[in-house]
């Protein structure tokens, strides 16, 4: 299909949010011409997308489905540069993310203090996009006939129940629905953005774009195309200039597409502010320094960068336990078995993400008493009067989430943590008017001292969970904090007996130890009165007591390992132009997502969030997409039932061995 030069609506960015907007608007009126422009490749029937169990491949630094941005070095990360990825494929993060179904707390949206954006007002839109594929006691807060599917997947690793039992012993109760918008302390079996009918990832491109393009002729798609800038004339956005996704030699190849009615920028938290800045919207002095003529003065563009700070901690598990380690590390038999099962039935290890259970937690009064004064003050000002806000998240991954070439052989589980509401803030700005140039970027990871105590606290909590799990078999010491050798908190390696099982009878150096820094767990048990062994579970009856030196070791570990959770937001904050408490350096958008000072231009993606949300952010991206579609449609004069904008169902019929098409 030839691409015209003029459209009614242009959506810049085919990510999680942009696909919702373009798909919905194309279904409001068949005469409304909509163009969706995406920098990455088309994801249609791409097995790296629709097979849930191979998602770690998209996280590798050589991935073609993500762009990796390097930050300035940071003293808060022990001199490291942070690496912040952004999806680079149609569907955005929904095509490559962890597929973890979590939702924001009700107070999160209310705290944005934007007209039309309270949780009560957004809940119908949250229900609109989802089909909740499990028994439900909270039917008033979930949806059951939307295009995006939510389920447990079609496989569950045994670490699920093991983890939940261990959490109960720590006073973290099992909760049937931790995503009810109000519960902030509990453990649950983790739901996933997976269609249980087919064992396939549920992403916004297949749900909103491919389904619509099969049935409509008014939706146009361009992939492998980068948005350079929005052209503004007499205070109105009138066109979009594009370039190829990668430079072609020294030539300057560009195209310009006119928009008769509306332009929506939805390029993501990193790219959307850069598009605005290249368009002349931002801090004038910085725009001039980058070679851009200022048009609209909005200093808040690129400011208020936020993320969730995560870290992964591996633990050894017993050799008779199940994990995905063999599959992801290249075992041909394990891979063939998993692929054969999925293509035959849509079930098995490839029909899950391996993240089977997790917690949202708040500290007790006794735990808060151990926090430093800085965090205690932060707690009082931000959390204390909002009981629906969790402080930390952690979950169990049924294998080692990382590079297996750097790890001793064996089976593992990983505790995956992230801080729900960091106080730290960062920024980014274009370094030139070249659309291919990397930004000047400081994400601000861990630059607020109030963020350290909860990160250390969660490490201790999850470590106690791991030690109480039946499958627990030790701690790979090289991947844990480096405590003093005589510390009771020191990491304990797997037992000599488990080492023999991993190594096999022909291994000549198993259990050959140099020095005393790494102690096998069996030897430690002989001197540990708190350890009890039963036929059912290994139980450590008392929590580890940490010294100040131990805490310092954990803090240093956090500085060396804290990283993005792929959840960045805030760089085009929805706030008054002069700013407010959420965006003190100035807002970028009004409550209808219009860019201050420009007509016909909206921004709609996670960059609009003025404050953080306590969840994996895909659910928020979907909510923003649904809201933006309604706002655009209303601005175009549609109302009532026209705003339903129902998209056609994306049909899946057969499992095909080709791995190319499953309809």
Swiss-Prot record:
Q: Which GO terms describe its biological process?
A: methane catabolic process; methanol metabolic process
Induction data = Induced by methanol. Subject to strong carbon catabolite repression.
Q: Which residue numbers does the motif Microbody targeting signal cover?
A: 661-663
- Give the subcellular location: Peroxisome matrix
Residues that, per the record, bind FAD = 8-39
Where does the secretion signal sit in this chain?
none
Query: What top-tier enzyme class does this entry carry?
Result: oxidoreductase
For the keyword Repeat, the answer is no
Q: Which reaction is catalysed here?
A: a primary alcohol + O2 = an aldehyde + H2O2
Q: Which InterPro entries match?
A: FAD/NAD-bd_sf, GMC_OxRdtase, GMC_OxRdtase_N, GMC_OxRtase_C
> Where are its TM segments located?
none
Q: Which cofactor does it need?
A: FAD
Residues forming the catalytic site: 567 (proton acceptor)
Pathway listed for it is: Energy metabolism; methane degradation
Q: Molecular function (GO) terms listed?
A: alcohol oxidase activity; flavin adenine dinucleotide binding
Query: Could you name the domain of life of the organism this protein comes from?
Result: Eukaryota
Cite the Pfam families for this sequence: GMC_oxred_C (PF05199), GMC_oxred_N (PF00732)
Q: Which PROSITE patterns does this chain map to?
A: GMC_OXRED_1, GMC_OXRED_2
Query: Can you list the GO cellular component terms from the UniProt entry?
Result: peroxisomal matrix
Its EC number(s): 1.1.3.13
Outline what the protein does. Answer: Catalyzes the oxidation of methanol to formaldehyde and hydrogen peroxide, the first step in the methanol utilization pathway of methylotrophic yeasts.
Domain-related comment = The C-terminal peroxisomal targeting signal (PTS) is essential for the efficient targeting and import of AOX into peroxisomes via the PTS1 pathway.
Family, according to the entry, reads as follows: Belongs to the GMC oxidoreductase family.
What is the annotated quaternary arrangement, including any partners?
A: Homooctamer.
Protein name from the UniProt record: Alcohol oxidase
Q: Which organism's genome codes for this protein?
A: Candida boidinii
The root-end lineage is: Eukaryota, Fungi, Dikarya, Ascomycota, Saccharomycotina
Name of the gene encoding the protein in the UniProt record: AOD1
């Amino acid at each position: 299909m030839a691409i015209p030069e003029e459209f009614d609506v242009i959506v810049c960015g085919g990510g999680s949010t942009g696909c919702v907007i373009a798909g919905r608007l194309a279904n409001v009126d068949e005469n409304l011409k909509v163009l969706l422009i995406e920098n990455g490749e088309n994801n249609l029937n791409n097995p790296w997308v629709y097979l849930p169990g191979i998602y770690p491949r998209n996280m590798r630094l050589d991935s073609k489905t993500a762009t990796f941005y390097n930050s300035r070095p940071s003293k808060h990360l022990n001199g490291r540069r942070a690496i912040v990825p952004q999806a680079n494929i149609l569907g955005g993060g929904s095509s490559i993310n962890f597929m973890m179904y979590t939702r924001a707390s009700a107070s999160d949206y209310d705290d944005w203090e934007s007209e039309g954006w309270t949780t009560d007002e957004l809940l119908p839109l949250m229900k609109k996009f989802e089909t909740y594929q499990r028994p439900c006691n909270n039917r008033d807060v979930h949806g059951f006939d939307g295009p995006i599917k939510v389920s447990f997947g079609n496989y569950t690793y045994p670490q699920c129940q093991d983890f939940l039992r261990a959490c109960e012993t720590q006073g973290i109760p099992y909760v049937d629905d931790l995503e009810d918008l109000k519960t902030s302390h509990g453990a649950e079996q983790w739901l996933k953005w997976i269609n249980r009918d087919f064992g396939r990832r549920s992403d916004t491109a297949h749900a909103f774009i491919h389904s619509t393009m099969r049935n409509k002729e008014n939706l146009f798609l361009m992939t492998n195309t980068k948005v350079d800038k929005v052209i503004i004339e007499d205070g109105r956005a009138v066109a979009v200039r594009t370039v190829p996704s990668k430079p072609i030699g020294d030539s300057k190849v560009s195209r310009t597409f006119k928009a008769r009615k509306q332009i929506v920028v939805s390029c993501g938290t990193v790219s959307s502010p850069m598009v605005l800045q290249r368009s002349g919207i931002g801090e004038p002095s910085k725009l001039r320094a980058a070679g851009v003529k200022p048009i609209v003065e909005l200093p808040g563009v690129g400011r208020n960068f936020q993320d969730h700070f995560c870290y992964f901690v591996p633990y050894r598990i017993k050799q008779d336990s199940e994990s995905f380690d063999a599959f992801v590390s290249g075992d041909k038999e394990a891979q063939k078995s998993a692929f054969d099962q999925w293509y035959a039935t849509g079930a098995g290890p490839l029909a899950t993400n391996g993240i089977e259970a997790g917690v949202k937690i708040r500290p007790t009064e006794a735990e808060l008493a151990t926090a430093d004064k800085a965090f205690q003050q932060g707690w009082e000002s931000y959390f204390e009067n909002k009981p629906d806000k969790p402080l930390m998240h952690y979950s169990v991954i049924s294998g080692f989430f990382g590079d297996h070439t750097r790890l001793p052989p064996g089976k593992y589980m990983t505790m995956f943590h992230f801080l729900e509401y960091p106080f730290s803030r960062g920024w980014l700005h274009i370094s030139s008017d070249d659309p291919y140039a990397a930004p000047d970027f400081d994400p601000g990871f861990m630059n607020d001292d109030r963020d350290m105590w909860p990160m250390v606290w969660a490490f201790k909590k999850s470590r106690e969970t791991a030690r109480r799990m039946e499958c627990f078999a030790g701690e790979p010491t090289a991947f844990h904090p480096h405590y003093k050798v005589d510390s009771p908190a020191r990491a304990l390696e797997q037992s000599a007996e488990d080492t023999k099982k991993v190594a096999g009878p022909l291994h000549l150096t198993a259990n050959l130890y140099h020095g005393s820094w790494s102690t096998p767990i069996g030897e430690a048990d002989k001197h540990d009165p708190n350890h009890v062994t039963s036929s059912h579970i290994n139980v450590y009856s008392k929590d580890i007591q940490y010294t100040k030196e131990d805490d310092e070791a954990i803090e240093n570990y956090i500085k060396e390992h804290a990283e993005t959770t792929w959840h960045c937001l805030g760089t085009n904050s929805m706030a008054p132009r002069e700013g407010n408490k959420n965006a003190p350096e100035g807002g970028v958008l009004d409550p209808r997502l219009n860019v201050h000072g420009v007509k016909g231009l909206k921004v709609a993606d996670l960059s609009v969030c003025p404050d953080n949300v306590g969840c994996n952010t895909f659910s928020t991206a979907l909510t923003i997409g649904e809201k933006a579609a309604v706002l655009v449609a209303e601005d175009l004069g549609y109302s009532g039932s026209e705003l339903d904008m129902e998209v056609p169902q994306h049909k899946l019929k057969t499992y095909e061995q080709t791995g190319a098409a499953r309809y």
